[in-house]
């Protein structure tokens, strides 16, 4: 986003700075001092810097509102900042004030920003969904400024946008459809979701499951050329369907407790790992569900935890070589993915202040996969580019094929697939189910979805 926004509004030098280890304070009148707010902490707090190198204080006030009052995550704050910096660059490039709201609606600053978003959609600079989000976030920014009376009535001669009521079709977690009235605006950017073509499934993104031949090639290269930790990460994705965020926030004690307290299920030879909720293993939206992990994989992970390689990595990390540490650490002792629990631990100041905190979001794992794919392509292997999340889709389709062999009515396996995939909404599961009916079995499965 940043580079395209900068090039489109090249006159503006506005940018985002981040304040690390941010803990907001409040003025305590009794002691005439500023004290830190309890339980409010942000590892990377965004600050929008204008072209004259001054802080855009309106945005800072909004970010503090999101952090303190709405308890929004660091990731959400960064995402909002990336949208508001685009609006700031627009203001500077056009030399318009945020309160430029003349009588004619099309001249108002918000309407003109809306027009630039539509122009960029046509030029292919941004997607309709990105433009829609950006416009909505700018309007929520205005809502905050109005609600907090930051502007006087004299300054607000006209409204930045008009509110409208509309109805949307919603789907319950059970698949039932109902109509719901929602508030919208006359500046809403409408778009139709892109149709799914070829071998795609939609599950928190557009996924491309590996074909059986691609999976075979990938596993061969994974075994021959990848590090042991990256092998295990990929095996967890392929054989449990877990997301990268979940895999990389598993702690050593989770593995050891499974072995000590559980017996392997004699039907499918798996252990049960509870993720999400209070487990301190992160999931999408904190959704709590069970992962079924093959017994052989738990054994392999436990052996890895006893290895010199893991001990060396753990000794360099925050949690040291203790069971509270992550299973998966880079060579430098950093987590592949920073967990919510670690952020909370930093908030509680459990670590030395001398230790510099940095957020990790799986980039090291993605780079390892890219390196492996490049090697496969260099060797002329017939395999497409894919992501770690595509391994989850591969698990989903493999599971579907296996389960479908044991029932006459495909609807009977929907709850089972939903549970194994950890889908909060059954419609995501149905996307996988549909792939069976849009397939010609020329190869074991040509994955497709018509969502």
Predicted features by range, described:
Residues 212-244, 413:
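Basic, Lys/Arg- and aromatic-enriched nucleic-acid-binding interface segment
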Residues 294-383:
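Active-site/catalytic core of tyrosine-dependent DNA strand-transfer enzymes
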Residues 59-78, 82-177, 220:
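N-terminal core-binding DNA-recognition domain of tyrosine recombinases/integrases
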Residues 250-300, 307-325, 334:
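Conserved tyrosine-mediated DNA breakage-rejoining catalytic core shared by Y-recombinases
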Residues 155-214:
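Flexible interdomain linker/hinge and immediately adjacent N-terminus
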Residues 421-446:
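Catalytic-site neighborhood detector that most strongly recognizes the C-terminal catalytic loop/helix
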Residues 390-423:
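C-terminal catalytic core of tyrosine-transesterase DNA break-rejoin enzymes
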Residues 147-152, 237-266:
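Short, charged phosphate-coordinating catalytic segments
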């Amino acid at each position: 986003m940043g580079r395209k926004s900068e090039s489109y509004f090249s006159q503006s030098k506005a940018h985002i700075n981040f304040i690390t280890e941010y803990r907001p304070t409040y003025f305590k009148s009794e002691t005439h001092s500023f004290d830190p707010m309890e339980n409010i902490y942000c590892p990377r707090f965004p600050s929008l810097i204008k072209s004259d190198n001054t802080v855009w204080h309106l945005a800072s006030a909004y970010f503090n509102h999101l952090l303190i009052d709405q308890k929004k995550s660091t990731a959400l704050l960064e995402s909002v900042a990336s949208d508001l910096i685009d609006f700031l660059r627009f203001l500077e490039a056009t030399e318009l004030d945020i309160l430029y709201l003349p009588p004619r609606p099309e001249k108002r600053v918000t309407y003109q920003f809306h027009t630039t978003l539509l122009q960029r959609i046509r030029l292919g600079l941004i997607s309709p969904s990105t433009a829609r989000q950006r416009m909505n976030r700018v309007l929520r920014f205005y809502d905050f400024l109005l609600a907090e009376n930051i502007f006087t009535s004299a300054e607000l001669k006209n409204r930045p946008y008009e509110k409208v009521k509309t109805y949307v079709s919603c789907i319950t977690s059970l698949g039932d459809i109902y109509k719901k009235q929602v508030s919208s605006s006359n500046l809403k950017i409408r778009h139709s979701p892109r149709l799914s073509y070829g071998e795609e499934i939609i599950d928190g993104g557009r996924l491309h499951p590996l074909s059986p031949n691609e999976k075979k090639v990938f596993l061969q290269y994974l075994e021959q050329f990848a590090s042991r930790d990256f092998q295990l990460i990929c095996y967890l994705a392929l054989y449990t369907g877990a997301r990268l965020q979940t895999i990389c926030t598993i702690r050593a004690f989770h593995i050891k407790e499974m072995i000590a307290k559980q017996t392997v299920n004699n039907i499918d030879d798996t252990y049960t790992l509870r993720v999400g909720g209070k487990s301190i293993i992160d999931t999408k939206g904190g959704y709590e569900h069970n992962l079924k992990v093959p017994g052989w994989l738990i054994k392999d992970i436990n052996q890895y935890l006893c290895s010199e390689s893991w001990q060396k990595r753990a000794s360099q990390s925050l949690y040291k070589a203790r069971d509270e540490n992550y299973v998966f650490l880079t060579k430098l002792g950093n987590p592949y993915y920073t967990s919510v629990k670690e952020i909370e631990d930093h908030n509680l100041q459990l670590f030395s202040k001398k230790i510099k905190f940095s957020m990790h979001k799986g980039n090291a794992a993605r780079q390892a996969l890219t390196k492996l794919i490049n090697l496969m392509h260099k060797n002329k292997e017939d395999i497409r580019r894919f992501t770690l999340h595509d391994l989850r889709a591969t698990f989903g389709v493999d599971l579907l094929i296996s389960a479908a062999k044991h029932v006459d009515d495909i609807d009977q396996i929907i709850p089972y697939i939903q549970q194994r995939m950890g889908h909060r909404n059954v419609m995501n599961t149905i996307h996988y189910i549909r792939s069976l009916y849009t397939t010609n079995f020329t190869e074991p499965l040509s994955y497709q979805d018509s969502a």
